[in-house]
């Protein structure tokens, strides 16, 4: 039954996720965001002039013009100059936060139609030397890898991988369990591509050469995937953060570039226009957790979202949990009591990659397309967030 304040996601599209320093390395986050935005707008069948606001998530500003964020996405996508834009940063939850912010704007009558999404150009994270006030006597400052520095939570003194290992150890998650789950992610993603499932949510990115000239080629699929992955190969990988660790390059999410976008409006407005929305927002939840076990964030966030939706896990048909690390996912699965057969059925971030600011939107898009494909009703999307947070969203398929 239609209720006042019901929010619809009318359409969704995302770019393929490009491997680190691969085919998308020279694209800014805003450029990728615009590609996804154009795809979502076209699929919605709405004139770009009708949008009242643009909200895009971005975690790490990597290009020189990154501070213009959502504003440049909107302008590049053909949104009128008069339409304002907002860039949000809830780290790994930024892409989902953009949908929440869009919904809140609509519910408070600040907007009728909002373009929301997330974007990240991780390959463009620069090396930096800190020393704006100059150097005296000693040689120049230390060169930092801004991407690696960002993965260290200085409040708790732990890298993201270490927080996943701690949370995993608390829940009895072994290295073997992590590698087996990582293999599942690769196999599920490979099967999804072979059966043409993931392609439905993608819009190609036209490629260009080092001179900025179009090559005539496009990136049409997620190329971080490793379909030939074996359990033997995963077992041989060394821990990435300490010899006694369990997180490896094979059982952690991939560093990639990409963007995703959705068109959000009130459900009533969408139905009056004769549109066929992908889904309805039933509720969302955001929670804080201990930073040293930041991967636990989806547990309280999912409970809040389910409570707001008036549902229990028993009613959820499909679930998307961001695979920041296999250890983190498995610990969340254990705490929430998730049925793995319902979760990440087309693979997850271990196979596809995790472009920080875009992932939250990607989770929701993937979830809605798969619910429609299977003719199922309810879905839950959730992600952990560096610094000790979690975000979750419950959706209902409208198809």
Model-assigned labels for residue ranges:
Residues 13-15, 26-35, 43, 177-267, ...:
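N-terminal extracellular/periplasmic Venus flytrap/periplasmic-binding protein-like
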Residues 30-45, 69-73, 98, 160-167, ...:
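Short, well-ordered amphipathic alpha-helical segments that serve as non-catalytic structural scaffolds
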């Amino acid at each position: 039954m239609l209720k006042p304040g019901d929010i619809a996601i009318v359409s969704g599209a995302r770019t393929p996720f490009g491997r680190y320093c691969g085919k998308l390395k020279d694209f800014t986050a805003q450029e990728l965001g615009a590609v996804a935005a154009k795809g979502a707008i076209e699929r919605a069948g709405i004139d770009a002039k009708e949008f009242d606001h643009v909200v895009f998530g971005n975690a790490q500003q990597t290009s020189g013009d990154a501070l213009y964020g959502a504003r440049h996405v909107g302008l590049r996508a053909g949104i009128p100059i008069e339409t304002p834009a907002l860039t949000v940063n809830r780290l790994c939850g930024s892409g989902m936060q953009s949908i929440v912010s869009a919904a809140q704007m609509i519910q408070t009558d600040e907007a009728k139609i909002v373009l929301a999404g997330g974007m990240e150009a991780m390959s463009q994270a620069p090396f930096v030397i800190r020393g704006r006030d100059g150097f005296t006597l000693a040689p120049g400052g230390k060169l930092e890898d801004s991407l690696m520095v960002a993965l260290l939570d200085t409040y708790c003194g732990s890298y993201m991988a270490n927080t996943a290992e701690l949370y995993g150890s608390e829940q009895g998650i072994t290295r073997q369990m992590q590698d087996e789950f990582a293999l599942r992610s690769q196999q599920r993603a490979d099967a999804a591509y072979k059966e043409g499932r993931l392609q439905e949510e993608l819009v190609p990115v036209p490629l260009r050469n080092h001179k900025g000239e179009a090559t005539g080629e496009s990136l049409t699929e997620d190329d971080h995937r490793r379909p030939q992955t074996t359990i033997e190969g995963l077992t041989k990988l060394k821990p990435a953060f300490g010899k006694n660790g369990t997180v490896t390059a094979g059982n952690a999410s991939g560093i990639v570039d990409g963007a995703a976008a959705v068109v959000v409006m009130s459900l009533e407005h969408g139905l009056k226009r004769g549109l066929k929305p992908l889904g309805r927002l039933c509720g969302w939840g955001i929670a804080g957790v201990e930073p040293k076990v930041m991967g636990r964030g989806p547990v309280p966030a999912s409970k809040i979202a389910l409570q707001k939706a008036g549902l229990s896990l028993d009613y959820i048909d499909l679930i998307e949990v961001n695979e920041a690390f296999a250890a983190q996912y498995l610990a969340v699965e254990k705490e929430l009591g998730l049925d793995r057969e319902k979760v990440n059925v087309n693979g997850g971030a271990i196979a596809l990659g995790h472009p920080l600011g875009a992932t939250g939107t990607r989770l929701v898009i993937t979830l809605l397309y798969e619910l429609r494909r299977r003719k199922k009703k309810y879905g839950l999307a959730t992600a952990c967030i560096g610094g000790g947070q979690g975000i979750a969203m419950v959706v209902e398929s409208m198809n």
